[in-house]
């Protein structure tokens, strides 16, 4: 058992604002360009791409904007006593206090500039409003990192996240359905309770900074679906033997996926804006400002799949997949690369479906699949 007295108070204030601006758009392409494409052979001039380009408009205003601000804090105190009755030594007891205060702001923007194009950005920042005093070196650094806005103390940033998304599903042709997405995510954390501050430029020069850790990720996904039946009708007509043969191939899907990630810890200086947006090459994931990442990785996958319906109720589906992975781990003398790869091929499935005649066993057995 323990003898203690505890008190606590807390507050929270939230401001949430959402806006759906009216549409403001301009023609996506000059009129002469749309007319020029329509005069090309029917395979292109009468495609969905040509029709869409003639009517497409570029929307300049976002479809949705949301801003959220959240202010929270608490004040708690706890005093522990030695005996269950009042004692003269109680006047020397110092309560243990905790008064965290934080201010978090988020911003989300959605845009649909064109049909089949989607953009999204999410930004969040959290600030620590506490005054850590000057009793320790890292507390003094935390105090010096504090900022003010319009004469009000707004503390220092302890967390930041940044996410982006770009999606593309263009209407190229009725037989071709390409797709593509590019997304990124960034996270940064500063630790005001670390053991010691870090120098921005080596061990003996540069300003002191709070220990910082950050990471990012990038994912690229490209692919397309091909409808050979529609392609055959557009090239050879509906009654062609080639069209009927191509119609048996029901699905063709091609795709490429690439993931890149990296993590940094114990860093004094935050990364550049390009790293936060993941607009960098693989070398930028491995190192920033001369500092190697604690870990970094790049994984890519290529896949293809197809399915065909053959006579006599036979259906064949096949898949090809190739995966390569490369990971870099931090060591004392640099980074150690670890590579791996795998291939899934051949991989196929054959199914046979028979529907017996209603005049025989079909009365009790409607279909048989093997």
Model-derived features: positions:
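Exposed, low-structure sequence patches enriched in small/polar residues
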Residues: 1-369
């Amino acid at each position: 058992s323990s003898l203690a007295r505890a008190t606590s108070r807390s507050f929270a204030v939230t401001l949430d604002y959402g806006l759906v601006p009216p549409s403001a758009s301009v023609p996506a392409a000059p009129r002469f360009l749309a007319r020029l494409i329509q005069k090309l052979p029917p395979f292109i001039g009468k495609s969905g791409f040509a029709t869409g380009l003639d009517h497409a408009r570029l929307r300049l205003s976002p479809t949705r904007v949301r801003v959220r601000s959240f202010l929270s804090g608490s004040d708690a105190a706890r005093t522990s006593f030695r005996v269950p009755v009042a004692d003269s030594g109680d006047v020397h007891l110092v309560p243990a206090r905790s008064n965290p205060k934080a201010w978090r702001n988020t911003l989300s923007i959605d845009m649909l500039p064109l049909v089949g194009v989607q953009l999204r950005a999410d930004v969040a920042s959290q600030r620590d409003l506490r005054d850590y005093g000057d009793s320790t070196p890292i507390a003094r650094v935390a105090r010096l990192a504090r900022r003010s806005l319009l004469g009000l103390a707004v503390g220092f940033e302890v967390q930041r996240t940044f996410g982006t998304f770009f999606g593309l599903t263009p209407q190229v042709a009725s037989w071709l359905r390409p797709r593509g997405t590019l997304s990124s995510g960034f996270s940064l954390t500063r630790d005001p309770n670390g053991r010691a501050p870090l120098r921005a430029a080596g061990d003996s020069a540069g300003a002191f900074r709070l220990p910082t850790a950050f990471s990012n990720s990038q994912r690229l996904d490209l692919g397309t679906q091909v409808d050979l039946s529609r392609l055959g009708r557009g090239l050879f007509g509906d009654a062609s033997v080639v069209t009927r043969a191509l119609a048996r191939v029901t699905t063709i899907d091609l795709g490429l996926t690439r993931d890149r990630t990296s993590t940094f810890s114990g860093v004094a200086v935050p990364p550049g804006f390009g790293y936060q947006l993941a607009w960098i090459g693989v070398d930028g994931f491995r190192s920033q400002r001369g500092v190697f990442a604690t870990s970094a990785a790049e994984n890519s996958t290529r896949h293809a799949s197809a399915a065909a319906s053959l006579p006599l109720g036979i259906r064949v589906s096949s898949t090809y997949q190739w995966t390569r992975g490369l990971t870099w781990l931090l060591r004392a003398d640099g980074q150690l690369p670890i590579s791996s790869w795998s291939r899934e091929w051949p991989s196929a499935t054959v199914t046979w479906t028979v529907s017996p005649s209603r005049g025989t066993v079909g009365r009790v057995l409607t279909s048989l699949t093997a």
